[in-house]
């Protein structure tokens, strides 16, 4: 492996830990240089191989991409896609570089010679097994799948080869007594073993249950928790995995009672016998697809062979799939769009499909387009963010010679479709042969197998205002829009979307309650809102109340067990629950934990250890941690924690008062009577003020809720919320002063960047700023009862902080909003602490501003931390000042410009607020 020579006169001011390995030393130097550039004088004194890129060095997802690109340039190698996504420490990067191949430009692949036209689809087949056997018997040597590697090389899999491998897998499963009605979990990547194991499971008469594979070591506990929920619901008897995931799979086996065996896919197959394939009924289960965003009670969509074939055939009829079509997909096979919409659809119609890893696309989006070019592909589905990613992340130099002229349908679905994305993608790639009518917005969901509506072929996307048409129902399917009573509404009247047809699930696996809730008179409730216009369905948003925090599920019992393992906390004496914050309507995660420690210092140390433990395991910090004495957590006579009762006691203020009173009575009553008496007036005033605030919020909160629910979406709801915030602050005695309003732009989009020090910051900004702006909030706020409703109705944007692919899509959506003229407000710190100090700023806001060419306006909030600091329940009156700074205009579109703007804004806010900068984010992560 050839590497560049690292100069001893590096511009980095950080020292690097001694290393005997040149690769490790080089990695440390590149990392140190980037960290110095990001954090300047506040950077850590040294970079070591085992520091966390994110927690210790402040290198988030955006910064990581920049770091990895620099490493590739410095070492002259090409890093593997998986290594790029999974690296958590400099040592991981060094190992990946040591194993990397020398860099070579990814040469555009030469177009493949077209295959001979396929044969007609098996219209008489009743099951997926019959479909594969039909093709394997009639044309066993014909290529079914081209598996593309990172370097663009491909390996062909024929129908006959897939059938033979599936038979061998089926024999391996039968040897393990797996048969009809059993479930088999597939924790496999988008690779060849998935194909054979999926059909081998069906050939054994069992039901495949796809699970997404682990790929982030620092998220493994959360991953295990989610998969255990699915394994428990599905009652899978065998888990088929790959070598790198065996350790995780073994852990799952120990904690999933029904799971009898974990086996790597390469050790599952047995020499195929002549045993005939089972005769399966069309109504037999063919797949359990667990919906993304499942709650603590996972919902597995049970689909039969008849459901899947009906959906595939209806899609084929709607988009006129024929023997001359060729497909390309980078979608994961464990997701319904990649599994059913891409692979199984291509299988049924006998058309070749090129399949590549999702990581290959995310790392270098141009690979998708070059795969289309190489195969002269006509069909390729993808979520909306993929099209936007291509526009944003592919350079012109990567497109030389590209030809997309054969691409007749770009099926855009699986998430809301953006008119701006469609327009930009079409304009950008028109010179390369992409036609406007090739963009085909669709709508579907797991409960309908995958597809439900599709735009007519040959028609340009239809846009109504800013909403993109999702087309018309698939043949044989019906869709209606209804009011809350289930009555169909008129055209252009928004309502709930319901559907029925042969593709629709029979219900949720082992979850009759969820099944009953989803169906009404034969119609399945999608949980979405939309309207009809000129025969087209326009989907406007979600209605389902998905209980998700930061893209993951939080289970109280498991969180309590996690906290109970902290030394000094009484095991079994922990309560975790969520409470609504009446000040801003959001929900806070509260942990109440008993300890025998009595001193305030010891309890503060326990709080810090609990915070560290939860953040390390879950990636989401509790908003409030209460460490209290024995007997505080309420329980039933049998010893079960009464979370609701403990929550009520917490909300009523009985927990801290009870603890505080006992401590003061036992330790201070005799010695500090005089001091206690001197504090009584202040305490009485605080309690009286707290009671006053709680009283009017008890009245004002429900009023706001009702007004928000009744108000139209958009500006009307925004005005109501702003007026409510002004009224509440006035009633609370919080005098609000605003400075610098002359700096607000008269027109055009802008990025507002504000410091974050209290839960009051959001209502304060809504009350103070007359500018028309939209907040950019963390996605987990959508799960809270009131704030989630406000976010959706006003049109605030949300971003995913933990899921890489979704986070990229959200970031692109933010930039699109700015480009479209919307002003956005960010809290670049992302969180706040009780102690004063400006936390490190994340780059997201400044990246969006640079890409959109919008000015950044610093906004400083003073006073809210004193009025309602972190962990406080009772506010106190006081003045609040909001200062709007002068706009800062981006001077370019480079990486350094993002860093420059971030540093200038942070320095200005630090100066105006009077608070120093805090450079260690770990305590707030």
Q: Where are the language model's segments positioned?
A:
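AMP-binding/adenylate-forming catalytic core of the ANL superfamily
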Residues: 373, 380, 501, 506-507, ...
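Conserved AMP-binding/adenylate-forming
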Residues: 408-410, 417-537, 543-546
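Conserved AMP-binding/adenylate-forming core of the ANL superfamily
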Residues: 145-196, 216-223, 279, 300-306
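Non-catalytic C-terminal accessory region of glycerolipid acyltransferases
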Residues: 1, 651, 680-684, 808-925
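AMP-binding/adenylate-forming catalytic domain of the ANL superfamily
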Residues: 78-97, 584, 615-640, 654-665
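Conserved AMP-binding/adenylation subdomain of ANL enzymes
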Residues: 309-326, 336-378, 393-398, 478
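AMP-dependent adenylate-forming
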Residues: 131-157, 285-288, 295, 444, ...
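Conserved pre-ATP/AMP-binding loop-to-beta segment of ANL
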Residues: 140-143, 270-290, 296-297, 302, ...
């Amino acid at each position: 492996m050839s590497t560049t020579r690292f100069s001893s006169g590096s511009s980095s001011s950080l020292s690097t830990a001694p290393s005997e390995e040149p690769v490790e030393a080089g990695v440390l130097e590149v990392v140190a240089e980037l960290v110095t550039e990001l954090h300047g004088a506040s950077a850590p004194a040294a970079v070591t191989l085992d520091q966390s890129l994110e927690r210790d060095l402040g290198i988030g997802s955006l910064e990581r991409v920049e770091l990895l690109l620099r490493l590739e340039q410095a070492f002259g190698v090409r890093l593997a896609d998986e290594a790029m996504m999974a690296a958590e420490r400099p040592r991981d990067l060094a190992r990946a570089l040591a194993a990397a191949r020398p860099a070579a430009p990814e040469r555009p692949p030469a177009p493949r010679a077209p295959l001979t036209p396929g044969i007609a689809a098996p219209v008489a087949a009743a099951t997926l097994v019959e479909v594969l056997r039909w093709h394997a018997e009639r044309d066993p040597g014909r290529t079914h799948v081209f598996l593309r590697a990172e370097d663009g090389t491909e390996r062909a899999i024929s129908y006959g080869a897939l059938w033979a491998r599936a038979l061998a897998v089926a024999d391996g499963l039968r040897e393990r007594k797996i048969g009809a009605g059993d479930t088999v979990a597939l924790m496999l990547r988008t690779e060849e073993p998935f194909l054979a194991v999926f059909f081998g499971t069906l050939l054994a008469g069992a039901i495949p249950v796809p699970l997404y594979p682990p790929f982030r070591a620092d998220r493994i506990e959360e991953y295990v928790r989610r998969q255990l929920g699915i394994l428990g619901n599905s009652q899978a008897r065998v888990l088929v995995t790959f070598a790198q995931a065996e350790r995780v799979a073994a852990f799952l086996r120990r904690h999933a009672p029904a799971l009898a065996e974990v086996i790597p896919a390469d050790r599952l197959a047995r020499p195929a016998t002549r045993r005939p394939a089972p005769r399966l009924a069309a109504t037999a289960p063919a797949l359990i697809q667990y919906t993304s965003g499942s709650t603590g009670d996972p919902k597995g969509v049970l689909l039969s062979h008849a459901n899947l074939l009906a959906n595939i055939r209806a899609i084929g009829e709607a988009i006129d799939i024929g023997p001359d079509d060729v497909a390309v997909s980078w979608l994961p096979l464990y997701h319904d769009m990649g599994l059913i919409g891409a692979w199984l659809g291509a299988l049924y119609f006998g058309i070749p499909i090129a399949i590549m890893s999702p990581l290959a696309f995310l790392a270098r989006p141009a690979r998708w387009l070059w795969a289309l070019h190489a195969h002269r592909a006509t069909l390729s589905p993808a979520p909306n963010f993929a099209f936007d990613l291509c526009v944003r992340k592919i350079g012109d130099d990567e497109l030389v010679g590209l030809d997309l002229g054969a691409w007749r349908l770009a099926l855009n679905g699986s998430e809301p479709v953006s008119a701006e994305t469609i327009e930009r993608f079409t304009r950008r790639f028109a010179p390369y042969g992409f036609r406007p009518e090739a963009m085909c917005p669709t709508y579907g969901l797991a409960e309908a197998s995958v597809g439900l509506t599709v735009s007519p072929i040959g028609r340009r996307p239809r846009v109504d205002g800013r909403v993109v048409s999702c087309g018309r129902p698939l043949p044989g399917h019906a869709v209606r829009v209804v009011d809350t009573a289930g009555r169909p509404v008129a055209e252009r009247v928004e309502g709930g979307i319901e559907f029925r047809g042969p593709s629709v699930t029979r219900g949720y696996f082992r979850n009759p309650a969820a099944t009953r809730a989803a169906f009404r008179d034969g119609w399945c409730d999608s949980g979405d809102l939309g309207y009809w216009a000129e025969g087209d369905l326009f989907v406007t948003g979600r209605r389902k109340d998905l209980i998700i925090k930061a893209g993951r599920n939080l289970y109280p019992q498991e969180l309590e067990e996690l906290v109970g393992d902290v030394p000094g906390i009484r095991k079994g004496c922990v309560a975790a629950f969520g409470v609504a914050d009446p000040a801003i309507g959001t929900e806070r995660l509260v942990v109440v934990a008993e300890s025998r420690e009595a001193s305030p210092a010891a309890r503060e140390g326990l709080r810090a250890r609990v915070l560290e433990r939860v953040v390390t395991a879950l990636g989401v910090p509790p908003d409030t941690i209460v460490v209290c004495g024995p007997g505080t957590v309420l329980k039933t006579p049998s010893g079960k924690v009464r979370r609701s009762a403990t929550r009520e006691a917490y909300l009523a203020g009985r927990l801290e008062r009870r603890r505080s009173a006992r401590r003061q009575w036992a330790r201070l009553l005799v010695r500090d009577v005089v001091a206690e008496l001197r504090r009584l007036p202040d305490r009485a005033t605080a309690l009286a003020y707290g009671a006053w605030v709680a009283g009017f919020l008890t009245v004002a909160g429900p009023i706001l809720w009702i007004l928000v629910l009744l108000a139209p979406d958009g500006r009307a709801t925004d005005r109501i919320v702003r007026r409510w915030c002004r009224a509440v602050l006035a009633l609370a005695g919080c005098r609000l002063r605003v400075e610098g309003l002359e700096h607000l732009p008269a027109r055009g989009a802008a990025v507002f960047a504000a410091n974050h020090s209290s839960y009051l910051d959001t209502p304060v900004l809504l009350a103070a700023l007359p500018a028309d702006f939209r907040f950019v909030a963390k996605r987990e706020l959508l799960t809270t009862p009131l704030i989630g409703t406000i976010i959706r109705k006003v049109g605030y944007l949300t971003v995913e902080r933990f899921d890489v692919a979704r986070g990229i899509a959200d970031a692109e959506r933010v930039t699109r909003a700015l480009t479209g003229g919307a002003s956005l407000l960010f809290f670049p710190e992302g969180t706040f602490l009780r102690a004063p100090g400006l936390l490190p700023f994340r780059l997201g806001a400044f990246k969006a501003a640079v890409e959109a060419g919008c000015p950044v306006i610093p906004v400083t909030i003073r006073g809210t931390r004193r009025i309602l600091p972190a962990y406080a329940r009772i506010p106190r009156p006081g003045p609040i000042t909001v200062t709007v700074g002068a706009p800062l205009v981006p001077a370019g579109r480079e990486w350094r410009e993002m860093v420059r703007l971030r540093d200038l804004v942070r320095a200005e806010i630090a100066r105006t607020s009077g608070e120093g900068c805090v450079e260690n984010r770990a305590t707030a992560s």
